[in-house]
Amino acid sequence: MAICQFFLQGRCRFGDRCWNEHPGARGAGGGRQQPQLQPSGNNRRGWNTTSQRYSNVIQSSSFSKSTPWGGSRDQEKPSFGSFDSGASTNRKEGFGLSENPFASLSPDEQKDEKKLLEGIVKDMEVWESSGQWMFSVYSPVKKKPNISGFTDISPEELRLEYHNFLTSNNLQSYLNSVQRLINQWRNRVNELKSLNISTKVALLSDVKDGVNQAAPAFGFGSSQAATFVSPGFPVNNSSSDNAQNFSFKTNSGFAAASSGSPAGFRSSPAFGAAASTSSAISTSAPAFGFGKPEVTSAASFSFKSPAASSFGSPGFSGLPASLATGPVRAPVAPAFGGGSSVAGFGSLGSHSHAAFSKPSSDTFGNSSISTSLSASSSIIATDNVLFTPRDKLTVEELEQFQSKKFTLGKIPLKPPPLELLNI
């Protein structure tokens, strides 16, 4: 056996447990012999004390007799050298085998709840003072249900409603509806900022035991139950889903086709409005309750025959909630203005039978109600919304269209003439 050079220098930290030989020491040979509690010998720097300290660390029993992971922090932890503390007490308190296993968790739970409520109050203060978008949902904990009382409305949806009311010359109703939503948002924020006992209990119940939300289709919204219904944006809901106001329901949009509708990609309306199928002209309230009931026909983004809607007839707020399957059609106001279109984003011909086949209207809602038009005539519609004639353009706009690049600040807002397009 090799002689321990560290022992000769008086600084071997393993003592009797050393694998090398300690000449002149009792129990030389280290690890092959049992460690002695009080080894003797003429050691130069008192390695016996070091031996006792490190031997206790290396013993396997030291890991099992120390305080377990889940032990109470108030409990006195044994040191490395004292193993006479009750192991049974450690096992009970550490691994939760006592008579009341949740007794030691209640203080931590109270701290967590207090911290959660303080975080919610702080978030509400920041939300109110930062000027962030107010029509949004809120959840203080990741992968937990949203707190009730907030609606998720995108700026695009509000802008669409603005255009719908603008075409109907009823902007005051739009302003009243938006103001009502703002007031309800402020009231809910104030409730969460000044929490009372009942509000705290309801809030913690929403966070911990809230209804599990299904994964939304294509990232739109959730199936959370409605608790924040605005009278300014009513929902014509005849289904049993209890849809939230302004919510993108997961069972809409690209769901399976409903009975009486051979088209795919729809079973219920996208915004919770009732959908129906009729054989003649149908009238119904818009999906969000804006304006008056309108005479409906083919739906927006429709790539099927008029007997079936491809994207759901009440896909956006200003569009109707029912679907007309008969050949008789009545025009409604387009979503993006212009012409007497059949639906918000344009529609197909009254006798088109396949997707992308001979539409009778322009792409963005400028159409003439005709029974059959060729593809070329449908591109150059009577109203020419997609293209602007030369005589309606100013000299500056015409120069910009004829140049290779637009000049910053002088880009025309009108569509270009058809003659200048290279197709």
UniProtKB/Swiss-Prot annotation:
Metal-binding in keyword set: yes
Function description: Required for the export of mRNAs containing poly(A) tails from the nucleus into the cytoplasm.
Protein name: Nucleoporin NUP42
FG repeats: 14-15, 80-81, 95-96, 218-219, 220-221, 271-272, 288-289, 290-291, 311-312, 336-337, 345-346, 364-365
SMART domains, per the entry: ZnF_C3H1 (SM00356)
Species: Pongo abelii (Sumatran orangutan)
Gene Ontology molecular function, alphabetical: zinc ion binding
Biased composition (Polar residues): 37-69
InterPro entries: Nucleoporin_NUP42, Znf-CCCH_4, Znf_CCCH
